[in-house]
């Protein structure tokens, strides 16, 4: 191609676009919507739940007999009291129908509510069978620093389908 062809092509192009105006920007630019306080609180709660509970951690829990666990430094008599039903749970959590991620959040919320209300014992109902929650809930409870012990609940509180959980309230006055 030479300069004459370029000039002819440029002239033809100019003739074709003669009378066309450039488009003006008439579109609105939208910012990303700001998160609500509820969304921020939920995200924060999820972060706390994920920092407490790992799905890959496998604690040493009993294979035979009732599900039970006792933290180091806690009197073994506490486990016996849980088994006998000496502790009456003040708060109940029913996890039937929950997904794992939702169950983790609810479990953290239950433990926080126990501390806030100075409730030393709570009941977590995970359901019968060999479902995911029945396997995961004890593993999650072992990982939480506020949990002192748990034991399979007596019949009146759910039996095989529930756990009684003993919460560490620190130096706060305990209720029984």
Curated annotation (Swiss-Prot):
Smr domain location: 93-168
RNA-binding found in the keyword field: yes
GO MF annotations, alphabetized: RNA endonuclease activity; rRNA binding
Top-rank taxon, per record: Bacteria
Keyword terms of this UniProt record: Endonuclease, Hydrolase, Nuclease, RNA-binding, rRNA-binding
Keyword Membrane: no
Pfam families cross-referenced by the UniProt entry: Smr
Gene Ontology biological process terms, A to Z: rescue of stalled ribosome
Entry-linked SUPFAM superfamilies: SMR domain-like (SSF160443)
Family: Belongs to the SmrB family.
General function of this protein: Acts as a ribosome collision sensor. Detects stalled/collided disomes (pairs of ribosomes where the leading ribosome is stalled and a second ribosome has collided with it) and endonucleolytically cleaves mRNA at the 5' boundary of the stalled ribosome. Stalled/collided disomes form a new interface (primarily via the 30S subunits) that binds SmrB. Cleaved mRNA becomes available for tmRNA ligation, leading to ribosomal subunit dissociation and rescue of stalled ribosomes.
Name of the featured protein: Ribosome rescue factor SmrB
Taxonomic source organism: Shewanella putrefaciens (strain CN-32 / ATCC BAA-453)
Lineage: Bacteria, Pseudomonadati, Pseudomonadota, Gammaproteobacteria, Alteromonadales
Chain's gene name: smrB
């Amino acid at each position: 191609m030479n300069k004459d062809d370029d000039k002819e092509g440029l002239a033809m192009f100019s003739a074709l676009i003669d009378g066309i105006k450039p488009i003006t920007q008439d579109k609105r630019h939208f910012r990303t919507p700001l998160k609500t306080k509820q969304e921020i609180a939920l995200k924060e709660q999820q972060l706390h739940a994920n920092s407490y509970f790992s799905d890959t951690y496998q604690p040493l829990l009993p294979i035979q007999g009732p599900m039970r666990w006792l933290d180091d430094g806690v009197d073994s008599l506490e486990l016996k009291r849980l088994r006998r039903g000496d502790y009456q749970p003040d708060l109940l959590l029913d996890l039937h129908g929950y997904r794992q991620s939702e169950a983790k959040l609810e479990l953290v919320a239950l433990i926080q509510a126990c501390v806030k209300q100075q409730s030393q014992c709570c009941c977590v109902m995970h359901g019968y069978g060999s479902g995911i929650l029945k396997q995961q809930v004890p593993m999650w409870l072992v990982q939480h620093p506020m949990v002192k012990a748990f034991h399979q609940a007596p019949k009146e509180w759910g039996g095989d389908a529930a756990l009684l959980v003993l919460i560490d309230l620190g130096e706060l006055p305990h209720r029984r």
